[in-house]
């Protein structure tokens, strides 16, 4: 239990969490990964760290209580070296990043509706990777406003920056020549075959999107812009092409929201208190206005100068977002036994 009378130091909460055997997942081939941490003291980043075992990693996190914790999608022969040449690159996982603030109408506030939209895009990406490339992948919530999809297969580990960029462009539809995918009728009235849900690649995705919208497959051109919006995935191309990118450690806390980095399934994503280890009822003094929003399953609105009673996990998130500060109460940090399986 962490007392919040007179204010709440987020580092104390994070330290309490990491001391309770949290559900942190071990990255594959841990000894070949570079680790990096952002600390609370001056927001300093510490990089080029290596661990030989999960015990070493957990001990470090319990001692330092990092604000953010990362590992490299790359494997290196010497991960603690300071230059790429010295590290000895052995291959990288294929990583995709979806940030919901890039979606129309979504901004800094962690609204459930925007998270739901981002999740649906991430699921679409996972399904397309498997259907079109034969690559299984794993979906994660980043603990703030985004989702990561990671694929770790033999051939994709060896891809260079340009190959990764082309795969990313496939999902963003950048450079798409639609006339080659869905040709229009010819001058003599010859009508090309309409797309089918069983077609490979983009034709199949457009056909399935059309059926979901109730659009006749022979008339997809009339609704093509909406259909392209339905199949496009708003990933950050720069993230995918970067072979030295860092991913968040699953089970760690995101210092921008105080929420878990969580592995997700494809059956649905319902933001709620299960994403936070913090429990209790606290007082929160608002310093900024917040329009009514649905956050982690609760409706929240704020007016500057007012004091609100609210659940600790909501208050911690709002404090880290800069909407005010916890002014009183007690926060209970859950032990590992209470976790929903990740």
Swiss-Prot record:
One of its GO terms (cellular component) is DNA-directed RNA polymerase complex. Transmembrane segments: none annotated. InterPro entries: DNA_primase_S, DNA_primase_ssu_euk/arc, DNA_primase_ssu_PriS. It comes from the Archaea. The keyword Transcription applies. SUPFAM superfamilies: Prim-pol domain. It is an enzyme of class 2 (transferase). GO terms for biological process: DNA replication, synthesis of primer. Its cofactor is Mg(2+); Mn(2+). Heterodimer of a small subunit (PriS) and a large subunit (PriL). Belongs to the eukaryotic-type primase small subunit family. This is DNA primase small subunit PriS.
């Amino acid at each position: 239990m962490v007392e919040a009378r007179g204010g709440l130091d987020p580092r104390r909460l994070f330290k309490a969490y990491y001391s309770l055997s949290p559900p942190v997942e071990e990255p594959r081939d841990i000894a070949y990964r570079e680790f990096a941490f952002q600390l609370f003291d001056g927001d300093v980043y510490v990089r080029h760290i290596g661990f030989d075992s999960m015990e070493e990693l957990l001990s470090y996190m319990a001692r330092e209580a990092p604000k953010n914790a990362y590992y490299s999608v790359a494997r290196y022969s010497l991960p603690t070296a300071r230059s790429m040449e010295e590290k000895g690159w052995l291959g990288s996982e294929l990583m995709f990043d979806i940030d919901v603030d890039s979606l129309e109408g979504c901004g800094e506030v962690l609204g459930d509706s925007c998270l739901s939209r981002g999740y649906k895009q991430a699921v679409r990406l996972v399904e397309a990777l498997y259907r079109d490339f034969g690559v299984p992948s794993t979906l994660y919530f980043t603990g703030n406003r985004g989702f990561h999809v990671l694929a770790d297969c033999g051939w994709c580990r060896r891809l260079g920056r340009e190959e990764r960029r082309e795969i990313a462009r496939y999902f963003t539809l950048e450079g798409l020549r639609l006339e080659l995918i869905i040709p229009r009728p010819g001058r003599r009235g010859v009508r090309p075959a309409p797309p089918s849900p069983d077609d490979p690649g983009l034709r199949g995705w457009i056909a399935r999107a059309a059926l979901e919208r109730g659009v006749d497959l022979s008339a997809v051109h009339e609704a093509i812009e909406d259909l392209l919006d339905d199949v496009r995935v708003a990933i950050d191309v720069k993230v995918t092409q970067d072979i030295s990118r860092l991913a968040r450690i699953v089970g760690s806390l995101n210092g921008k929201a105080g929420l878990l980095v969580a592995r997700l399934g494809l059956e649905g994503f319902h933001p709620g208190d299960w994403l936070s280890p913090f429990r209790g009822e606290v007082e929160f003094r608002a310093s900024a206005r917040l329009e009514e929003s649905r956050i982690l399953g609760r409706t929240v609105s704020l007016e500057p100068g007012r004091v609100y009673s609210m659940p600790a996990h909501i208050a911690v998130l709002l404090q880290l977002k800069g909407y005010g500060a916890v002014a009183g109460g007690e926060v209970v940090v859950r032990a590992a036994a209470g976790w929903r399986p990740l």
